[in-house]
Amino acid sequence: MAVPTGKLAHLSAISPRDFTMPNRMAAAVLNDIGTEELAHLEMVSTIVHQLTRDLSMEEIEKSGFGPYYIDHTVGVWPQAAGGVPFNACEFQSKGDPITDLFENLAAEQKARSTYDNILRVVRDIPEIADPIKFLRAREIVHFQRFGEALRSIQEELDAKNFYAFNPSFDNPCTASCKTACQKS
């Protein structure tokens, strides 16, 4: 839930990136997906709560949940499966829409892979597997939408070298890379 592939990290990374998108379509995609990620965070948190709320002390001790319980009882606290607490060090907004969208694309694939791993563990528990399947499907849709946003930005740039400059910071131009680099 709180690793770089987690919902809280993804939500925190996507939401501020929409401000540097150079066109309205891309900004809207990031805003829409960021809003949806908030709902997904609630779903994952609800699953965690439902799995832990009625644990007995014996179950807590046998399952290795003791250290978590000592710090948080059965409160939902964002941390990785390995126990690393959430922090904001693993993600950022670069302010370059191409860079940020590629990072979003990668995050969606990492989330899909995480859901694949979860489904291997909980495949026989439909109360968990069904919402995880839904979330996995949404990651695929998000990946496609981020790809559309990336294409919309690249189509507005110099097709010969759209890495010549940062489209959210440098003056937009349709000139060659050499001309873009010589601006005064």
Report the location of each language-model feature.
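Non-heme di-metal
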Residues: M1-S184
